[in-house]
From Swiss-Prot:
Name of the protein: 5-deoxyribose 1-phosphate isomerase
Pathway linked to the protein: Carbohydrate degradation
Keyword Cell membrane annotated: no
Family listed: Belongs to the EIF-2B alpha/beta/delta subunits family. DrdI subfamily.
Catalytic activity from the UniProt record: 5-deoxy-alpha-D-ribose 1-phosphate = 5-deoxy-D-ribulose 1-phosphate
A Pfam family recorded for this sequence: IF-2B
BP GO terms, sorted: L-methionine salvage from methylthioadenosine; pentose catabolic process
Keywords: Carbohydrate metabolism, Isomerase
Site feature Transition state stabilizer, where: C160
Gene of this entry: drdI
Binding site for substrate: R49, G50, A51, R92, Q199, N250, K251
NCBIfam families reported in the protein's UniProt record: eIF-2B_rel (TIGR00524), PRK05720.1 (NF004326), salvage_mtnA (TIGR00512)
Species of the source: Clostridium botulinum (strain Loch Maree / Type A3)
Functional description taken from the UniProt entry: Catalyzes the isomerization of 5-deoxy-alpha-D-ribose 1-phosphate to 5-deoxy-D-ribulose 1-phosphate, as part of a 5-deoxyribose salvage pathway that recycles this toxic radical SAM enzyme by-product to mainstream metabolites.
């Protein structure tokens, strides 16, 4: 099978091409986008998902908005751009990469406010492409730092999908797995199914399996059993937002995995691009948690799995307390506790 990439850019036709992740692993289909409104829908409906991939997608979305923005003067152009930026930012509130990418695009426009609006539009096009390329470099660097914490023969547990399908390439949590394979290591990955959207089984297992990596899918409630059997040496997950104190928002179920890892004395590593670290958010209590459609819990593949009308609580994310985390691994280096102090130092480098 050809390499699965979540995001592609067609430079000749000025189109964003996204892998439809809602139908994996049964079908592999790509959808083309060229409007901010359609990009909004792609993020909201989880055709594209994963904090880094969402950020890159939003940057292209704001470029599409810029293409049709007023050209009479910068004031009207930027007013329109700000409105569309807020619109795109509302698509999924938990992933900080979304607002990060949009702010970069806004800042780039402001930096060039004295130029002709048509020229600014071209500049924003190149900036979106730069954000895309930078994400690839960040993911590879995270993997290079993470692999130093592992060794040949390691057993790894991961939750949700912080893989190549959640980023522009390599992934964050999966990046060291690809690099370990390149080194010829013999290792095993256990991928939590990740209810209710099943990203662990439909996405992580798919991409690792296609890459020839030894991966075993387990249901979420099997994690404790696998840990108790000594099969797990490290837990590696991604993140959607990290607060200043190290509290980490990630896919629902991650907090439970961290509690189990702490009980069994297994290191818990967060693979984190620095854009996912939100120093302005003091603790996990300040992170907004998206609540999703109840039918994600009560039905699957067109079949009801619970009584119709039953009450449902369906948060998309939970927050792992910083005290359960062994290290936060970024493209700039490995951050150990105390996180509040050391995360600040990271941004001073």
């Amino acid at each position: 099978m050809a390499e699965l990439l979540a995001i592609k850019w067609d430079d000749n036709r000025d189109k964003l091409i996204l892998l439809d992740q809602t139908i994996l692993p049964n079908k592999i289909e790509y959808i083309e986008y060229d409007t901010a409104e359609d990009v909004y829908d792609s993020i909201k409906d989880m055709i594209v998902r994963g904090a880094p991939a969402i950020g890159v997608t939003a940057a292209y979305g704001l470029y599409f908005a810029a293409k049709v923005a007023p050209e009479d003067n910068f004031k009207n152009f930027f007013k329109y751009l700000k409105e569309k930026s807020a619109y795109l930012d509302s698509s999924r509130p938990t992933a900080v990469n979304l607002s990060w990418a949009l702010k970069i695009m806004e800042s780039k426009a402001l930096e060039n406010k004295d130029k002709d609006v048509k020229e600014i539009k071209s500049i924003l096009r190149e900036e979106a492409k730069r954000i895309h390329e930078e994400d690839i470099e960040i993911c590879k660097a995270i993997g290079e730092n993470l692999v130093t914490l592992l060794k040949d023969g390691v057993g790894i547990l991961t939750h949700c999908n912080a893989g190549q399908l959640a980023t522009s390439k390599y992934g964050t949590a999966t990046s060291p797995m690809y690099l370990a394979k390149e080194k010829g290591w013999n290792f095993k990955v256990y991928s939590d199914e990740t209810r209710p959207r099943l990203q662990g089984s439909t996405l992580t297992a798919l991409e690792l399996y296609e890459a020839g990596i030894d991966v075993t899918t387990i249901t979420d409630n099997m994690a404790a059993m696998v840990m108790s059997q000594g099969k797990i040496d490290a837990v590696i997950v991604g993140c959607d937002r990290i607060a200043a104190n190290g509290d980490t928002a990630n896919k629902i179920g991650t907090m439970g995995v961290s509690i189990l890892a702490k009980y069994f004395g297994i290191p818990m590593y967060i693979a984190a691009p620095t854009p996912s670290i939100d120093i302005d958010t003091k603790t996990g209590k300040d992170i907004p948690i998206e609540e999703r459609n109840p039918e994600e819990v009560t039905s699957r593949f067109g079949v009801w799995t619970a009584p119709r009308g039953v009450k449902v609580y369906n948060p998309g994310f939970d927050v792992t307390p910083h005290e359960n985390i062994t290290a936060i691994v970024t493209e700039k280096g490995i951050v150990y506790p105390p996180f509040e102090e050391n995360l600040k130092k990271l941004f001073e480098k």
